[in-house]
Amino acid sequence: MYKAKISNQSNSDHINDGLKLKNAFITAALKCVPPGDKPEKKELENCFPYFKNEINLLKNIKVIIALGKVAFDACVDFYKKEYNLTKKIKFGHNNVYTLPNNILLVGCYHRSPRNVNTGRINERKMTLLFNKFFKLI
């Protein structure tokens, strides 16, 4: 996010370290760390009301970049429940969909060690994706 000029510093180490985001909000669909980093359906269901409240509080959303399939699926689930979304939406890096309220949903591979080590995602790909979509806001 720093290289795409969305944040004022390259990392955040604690809550009061001065990080500022420009026209961005970061959240997680899953609010806990599940055993083995494999979220179960029940865990996602338990967190859904919090995720839903966050999305509903944000009034000027133009683009949602979902980092990973779990985040992407949570966004799709939200739109199915809140907007009766019926079209088929499939996760993929740089897959873009216009949602019922004209917000763009963008899939992005998660920066997990496996995805980074295999080259599926890297800093350059993330920066290109962020630059492409943050020009819209």
Explain the meaning of each model-derived region:
Residues 1-137:
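A polyanion-binding, active-site-adjacent surface
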